[in-house]
């Protein structure tokens, strides 16, 4: 579930998943546009 995925991110990175990773990656976020953050 999404809850379990968020819990895994928190446990592995020690960061809250949504403020740090909510709009992460290529073309993520509202409207599906934006610049890639890194090679991930």
Swiss-Prot record:
Tissue and organ expression note: Expressed by the venom gland.
Task: Describe the task this protein carries out.
Answer: Snake venom phospholipase A2 (PLA2) that shows presynaptic neurotoxicity. 10 ug/ml of this protein produce complete neuromuscular blockade up to 70 minutes, without inhibiting the responses to acetylcholine (ACh), but with a partial inhibition (67%) of the response to potassium chloride (KCl).
Pfam families named among the record's database cross-references: Phospholip_A2_1 (PF00068)
The record's top EC class is: hydrolase
What is the protein named? Phospholipase A2 neuwieditoxin-2
Q: How is the cofactor bound?
A: Binds 1 Ca(2+) ion.
Enzyme Commission number(s) of this protein = 3.1.1.4
Per its UniProt record, the required cofactor names are: Ca(2+)
Q: Which reaction does it catalyse?
A: a 1,2-diacyl-sn-glycero-3-phosphocholine + H2O = a 1-acyl-sn-glycero-3-phosphocholine + a fatty acid + H(+)
**What are the subcellular locations of this protein?**
Secreted
| The species this protein was found in | Bothrops pauloensis
Quaternary structure annotation from Swiss-Prot or TrEMBL: Dimer.
- GO terms for CC? extracellular region
Which residues of the sequence carry a binding annotation for Ca(2+)?
27, 29, 31
Q: Name the keywords, alphabetized.
A: Calcium, Disulfide bond, Hydrolase, Lipid degradation, Lipid metabolism, Metal-binding, Neurotoxin, Presynaptic neurotoxin, Secreted, Toxin
Q: Output one GO MF annotation.
A: toxin activity
Q: Give the family, as the similarity comment puts it.
A: Belongs to the phospholipase A2 family. Group II subfamily. D49 sub-subfamily.
GO terms under biological process: arachidonate secretion; lipid catabolic process; phospholipid metabolic process
